[in-house]
Amino acid sequence: MKKTAFTLLLFIALTLTTSPLVNGSEKSEEINEKDLRKKSELQGTALGNLKQIYYYNEKAKTENKESHDQFLQHTILFKGFFTDHSWYNDLLVDFDSKDIVDKYKGKKVDLYGAYYGYQCAGGTPNKTACMYGGVTLHDNNRLTEEKKVPINLWLDGKQNTVPLETVKTNKKNVTVQELDLQARRYLQEKYNLYNSDVFDGKVQRGLIVFHTSTEPSVNYDLFGAQGQYSNTLLRIYRDNKTINSENMHIDIYLYTS
């Protein structure tokens, strides 16, 4: 009897350390799998830069920043953002509208995003890095405890387990970018997402979907990037899309053909 009880408790403990199946489905309603872009349609430069962005490059992460400075009306310039970077001092954040800027300019904000220097236009030349979105309000946006986001992942229709620690946030309202950066890093590490076929990059198409209980879902074609360099590859985050982290989960669909 004691052995049976111990076995049951061990099973429960192991289950809680991985992402459960949460309101998932084997196919996304947002984008048909046949419409997903194939990895072979990306140029080699773009594929290499996607790998660099999501796996190797450090991210801009900070809390409780404030700035009234701008370069253009759809930007906010954070002077002295980098304190120990080899090249950059300032961070120029670009949004797709002035309305978004007005929500954050002069307010206490938190930042989490992928930044780049090559082809960054604005600020002090060679001393300013650029980033699209990645901004949330600081005040009254902190969870009482860190949120670990459950992930459902299917590879060619077969569900694979994803550790529950893979994607997490301490924010009530979080940018999709923050969650997406963490998820794609895992996909690169586990599945060589942005490797070429020669270097064991077996995944040929993919879709990531961010679901919440109260808002429309947000989805990205994992190989749907435009252009070759960070200034265009990262433009999907320019809308600074945020979602409520409560009762949310992520669905990922990967295909090897």
UniProtKB/Swiss-Prot annotation:
Subunit structure: Monomer. Interacts with MHC class II molecules alpha/HLA-DRB1 and beta/HLA-DRA chains. The interaction with MHC-II molecules occurs at both zinc-dependent and zinc-independent sites. Interacts with T-cell receptor beta variable 7-9/TRBV7-9.
Co-factor binding comment: Binds 1 zinc ion per subunit. The zinc ion is necessary for the toxin interaction with MHC class II.
Chain's role: Staphylococcal enterotoxin that activates the host immune system by binding as unprocessed molecules to major histocompatibility (MHC) complex class II and T-cell receptor (TCR) molecules. In turn, waves of cellular activation, cytokine production, and migration into the lung tissue and airways occur via alphabeta T-cells. Also causes the intoxication staphylococcal food poisoning syndrome. The illness is characterized by high fever, hypotension, diarrhea, shock, and in some cases death.
Organism: Staphylococcus aureus
Residues that, per the record, bind Zn(2+): H211, H249, D251
Keywords: Disulfide bond, Enterotoxin, Metal-binding, Secreted, Signal, Superantigen, Toxin, Zinc
An example Gene Ontology molecular-function term: MHC class II protein binding
Main localization, broad class: secreted
Stretch forming the signal peptide: 1-24
Disulfides per UniProt: C120-C130
Name of protein: Enterotoxin type A
GO terms for cellular component: extracellular region
Family: Belongs to the staphylococcal/streptococcal toxin family.
UniProt cofactor(s): Zn(2+)
Location within or outside the cell: Secreted
Note: This toxin seems to be coded by a bacteriophage.
UniProt key word Disulfide bond: yes
